[in-house]
Amino acid sequence: MKPELFFSELWQDYIEITPQAEKIKQLFEATDGTVINDHVAFRTFAHTPLQLDNLVPLIFSMGYELQDEYTFTAKKLRAKSFIHPDPSVPKIFISELRTELLSEDAQAMIKKYTDQIEEKDLDLSVFWSARHWEMPSWDEYHALMEETEYGAWLLAIGVRVNHFTVSINHLTTTNEIRDVLQRVKDAGFGVNTVGGEVKGTKESLLEQGSTMADRQEYEFAGDQKHEIPTCFYEFAMRHPNAEGVVYQGFIEANADKIFESTNAK
């Protein structure tokens, strides 16, 4: 599958549960023309058929190369980012929950569901395949959330793109992230304020911000219906270094705060 088709399929799946993204994209298209996607991100569980290292060959099949690796100690995550030789192709960021670092109760709860994942050859459609297990109960979701918001989100939503990202560098009306976020707020969308609305600085070469996740009603086990966070839209401004080369990587401290965009509390 070529990257163009991959991202087209992803976008259609994404806006099904993130309608705010389509509205925000149209908002900027009206004044800035084509909105360029900087990167997408995914979440998964370690120690399962869907673990990060099993997904990597699929990304490589589209011509991507490994860019870097990351560790998020407090959230018990590890991650890898991937970059394509064609600079017009968005970057990809995949993280996984290191379940072995969770409490025994949380590990058992997750295993109850991830044991339902069918062992089979994976293809790129896995990235919009959602849950490979039954929906948990509301009590299980809520209990897991107390220990890992990331894990609770993943248990309910499954493997779907977590966010797309507007490349502020390619906007024509502004290159200031605060202006972009203000415009998003003026349009009625909430933004992630954890660590401040803007994560990172010009000096660190990467400034990021995001909306708070959309919310949709899901039916949990036992016919219990509850509204939960789905996915969000990110905004990234990349700056050049002293040699004039625009930074293309990711910064752990920024990403750590961006993860909070799906918090239910």
Spans of features found by a protein language model:
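Conserved active-site alpha-helix within GNAT-family acetyltransferase domains
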Residues: V56
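Extended, well-ordered protein cores
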Residues: M1-D53, G63, Q67-K265
